[in-house]
């Protein structure tokens, strides 16, 4: 890893891909509200005989892939905070202060947005709906919520965000270690997908809930990278000339 005090120029950023793909995905998700895809996928994991989702009380899904996995990601976040703090005092970490700061900020924002959005949107979980043994009435994302004394707290997906928030690692590594950054992207996407499917099997979320979560996490991490780390080659060249003049 390069350890110079001057950060390297950022690799070219394809804004059409970074912004366009999430935008198209969001439009598709809105259009999917006109279909029964979410319900159809949820029914694949629902056992009408038992009257519950097949993974509702699964030790693997609840204790391992939910509780323990979340603790691991929290531990990683704490480690990132310690690294960022250490970058103010430890010489070996000082060149990476901005990367570590971007990582910490991205992790914080990509997880903290979930709870307030759940409260505002009040979307019900599949396991709470009449179609799956519950007592609540289904409503599309952009439709008014039926009157209830138990508002939903299921959009976007909190556990999916635990995985997709690691997009932050991709951006933190993007300029210095591009190959490792690509591996981090694949890992974050795979982990978020596994967490998403596991919660769908438990009846905690619909498919669209988790895709929305991936979009939000990506956009948050991209925004943090752009404002904190992104430096086109022209800016780096100008900084180098300024240092040369100062010397």
Describe the function of each predicted region.
Residues 37, 89-96, 119-127, 204, ...:
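Transmembrane helix-loop junctions in multipass membrane proteins, especially transporters and channels
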Residues 84-120, 181, 185:
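Interfacial segments of alpha-helical transmembrane regions
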Residues 71-91, 159-175:
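Transmembrane alpha-helical segments in integral membrane proteins
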Residues 27-30, 110-115, 190-200:
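Aromatic-anchored segments of alpha-helical transmembrane domains
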Residues 22-26, 76, 103-112, 214, ...:
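Alpha-helical transmembrane spans of integral membrane proteins, capturing the lipid-embedded, hydrophobic core
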Residues 31, 78-85, 113, 117, ...:
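Alpha-helical membrane-inserting segments
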